[in-house]
Curated annotation (Swiss-Prot):
Residues 398-417 bind DNA. It holds the Pfam family Mu-transpos_C. Residues 8-74 form the HTH Mu-type domain. One of its GO terms (molecular function) is DNA binding. GO terms for biological process: DNA integration; DNA repair; DNA transposition. This is Mu-like prophage FluMu transposase A. It comes from the Bacteria. The keyword DNA-binding applies. It comes from Haemophilus influenzae (strain ATCC 51907 / DSM 11121 / KW20 / Rd). The keyword DNA-binding applies. This transposase is essential for integration, replication-transposition, and excision of Mu-like viral DNA. SUPFAM superfamilies: Homeodomain-like, mu transposase, C-terminal domain, Putative DNA-binding domain, Ribonuclease H-like.
Amino acid sequence: MDNQSLKTHYSVYELANLKLKTLPSAPKNIWEQAKRENWKSQKRQGRGGGLEYELASLPIEVQNELLLKTTPEQTAVALQKIEETRPLASNEVWQLWDEASAKAQEQAKIKLGTMFAVANLVESGVNVLDAFRLVCGKENAERLKNNEKLLSVGSLKNWWYRVKDAPRQDWLPLMLNNSGKSSKNVAEIDEAAWQFFKNFYYSREKPSLAHSYEVLKQAAQYNGWRIPSRSSLKRKMERDVPKTEEVFRREGQYALSRLYPSQVRTVAMLQAMEWINGDGYQHNVWVRFPDGEIKRPKTWLWQDVRTRKVLAARTDKSENTDTIRLSLLDVISRYGLPKHLTIDNTRAAANKKMTGGVKNRYRYQVNENEVQGIIPALGIELHWTSIQFGKGRGQAKPIERAFSHGGLGDYVDKHLLLRGAYAGANAYEKPDYDGKNGAEQPVDYATFLMALEQGIQQWNNVGNRLTEICAGKSSYAEAFERDWAVAEKRPISQSQMRLLLTLHEEVRLNQDGTFYLNAGKIGTNKNRYESLALIGTSHKRVVVRYDPANLHDKVWVYAXTGEYLAEAEITEKAGFGDQMAGREHNKAMRNWVKHTEKAAKERAKAEEMELSNYAPAVEFEERFLEMLPEPVKAPQTQAEEVEYEEVLDFNTVRKVPKAVEVEAEEISEFNRDWEKGLELLKKSKGR
């Protein structure tokens, strides 16, 4: 609002309608006062004629009241004009206006009206202090009627000195400061000092503000810089440095990414047991394991993504492959195979025995020919939690919610059966048992397992869960039973069950069908296994699946491509002079040679018979049949007496039949006649 927008002349009827306290209420009486005090007038413009009186010729008290009375209307007009002609948001002042809340903007508009009233009075010749007093009195009269907080002259003064030298089109955003505090507290600091302070404070070492300010004072004294107080400097930091810049410079990329709005996902399209996720949880309870060691156990849990029910759990001293494998076995044997599975990229979860063959494992070296792990071998699609800026986003898994405050940490770790064994979530939350902070007593392993099972059941059965699927009406367990009843089932086969019951190891297969396993080795001593079915096979390397709890039982051998080959059994070393063990070994070897030889001969005989079926039959013309001699029959020989000879077989002398030379005269004569006939046949065809 500028001077030209102010109304400069009023008629007696307009003055009467304003109901000013400093003028009579009747138009006739106002006209008489104007005539008596000789107010300056001019002919009224427009219809009706008459006179209009100049505002400046009215008594000063009338002018002030009139200006205050008409300011709201003038303010409304000015606001509309400002909104139409306001600068772009690139203007720093107006950018703050665009970022302010609606409530802050409304309060700024109220303050703007008081500033326009002060400006009108000052421009009409009123002393600025009198203008503050007049505006404050009028504003407080209105606020008393509405039971609102009263305005002080000091606040008006601070607002006025904030805007009086600024262009009027920028007064509105300058009124955004909610308090009436003076702008004198704005930090006055040399640019070099400010840059020095920012480079020191906004660093990854994250120094405290107190320490940084002391360093700044020393540098300012040495360089002659002008610096404000610490509180003023803190306000300047809050005003001039965005929170995002502070987080990045002090904490890094990952912390900055945490400020970004999280993604909200829906699970409505999933079926129960279609997608599961798992993670390990370190319990805050001291447990005495069967071997006598006292540790805080770690449990691996699997959870259904759709309904959030915890499906199975296995616990041990640490997170390892066996707890993950066996807990997955519990889930699949009870509910069938899931289609998808999500886990963290940890050393235990992402090891090759569980995830071998997965190309995007990003842990351990990925080889093109490596053995398939249990999860991909079962046909389950594996998903990793994302890695952002060098750190995992484990919070993306739904099961993480179960580990937060009020979750399984309460239902299990603070179970009645575990009273006195609680270790506290951290060093500052250790319970004070009988005045001895941290004097907790461990519970036995069996008691802990009972508390774990009961705690998980209680967690699953809490009613009215506020998840997308439970919708505040059912528990995790109820939602799962309802949805799993109509879900697609994927039962597990016996061969798939064997994958879960066993671990695997890729080994070198010797020509004699033996191999060594690293599993169960002590020092350099390894278990040796053998399989007669693998002797002489073309497989150089094979995959051996074994039960880690029973390494002295049979193991199963597979090709590197996944085909099942044979079973193998562990062997024991025999003593150097153990003759009985030698005889048993020789007997087993002879039996194997005998049966292998017999099987080879049978196969050869069958192959010869099969080959004869494919040989073309020889057809002769009738005129050549008489030229072919009759087949010569083998002469009948009399039974000959079999002679034996003694042969040394290892440590035993055995009698075997002597080799008899075959007389081949009759056979050779037959061959000559047969070849002669074939030669005649060729000549006849050539003719």
